[in-house]
């Protein structure tokens, strides 16, 4: 048994982060690796990453990291497990082919996907934008009526340009 990663984290924080990013994963299963979440532990930061190749999301959480490393497992299954746990602290560790979720009363195992197949999300350096969320929400409400809900072919606006 060779442990690749081992951490302890607050269930509440982990569940909240998973809830936010799990919606971006590929639920249709067209590309199976995109239904996974990349779990990375480094320097007391636990990072969760998902993508559907159009949009990617990363969430960073404080955690007690016993061994730095990574895990890669199905985000929906992981979220369902975490959501139903009663313990306030969770231990997560990964081995060659499995990701383990452990509490004092239970232990779950999820199949681990191949890290090399998961797409890398590259963020531009020094590209941080900070704003109050209500300002973005108000702006989106104004332009939403102009965005088509269906791709009708030809020239149809199905997105919003941010500048």
Regions found by a protein language model. Name each.
Residues 1-163:
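Structural preference for solvent-exposed beta-strand-turn elements
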């Amino acid at each position: 048994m060779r442990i690749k990663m081992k951490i302890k984290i607050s269930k509440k924080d982990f569940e909240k982060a998973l809830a936010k990013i799990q919606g971006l994963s590929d639920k249709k299963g067209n590309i199976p690796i995109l239904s996974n979440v990349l779990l990375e532990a480094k320097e007391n930061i636990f990072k969760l990453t998902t993508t559907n190749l159009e949009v990617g999301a990363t969430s960073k959480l404080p955690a007690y990291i016993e061994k730095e490393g990574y895990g890669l497992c199905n985000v929906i299954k992981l979220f369902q497990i975490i959501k139903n746990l009663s313990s306030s602290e969770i231990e997560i560790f990964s081995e060659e082919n499995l990701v383990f979720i452990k509490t004092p009363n239970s232990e779950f195992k999820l199949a681990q996907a191949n890290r090399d197949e998961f797409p890398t999300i590259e963020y531009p350096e020094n590209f941080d934008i900070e704003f109050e969320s209500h300002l973005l929400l108000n702006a989106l409400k104004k332009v939403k009526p102009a965005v088509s809900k269906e791709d009708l072919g030809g020239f149809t606006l199905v997105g919003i340009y941010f500048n």
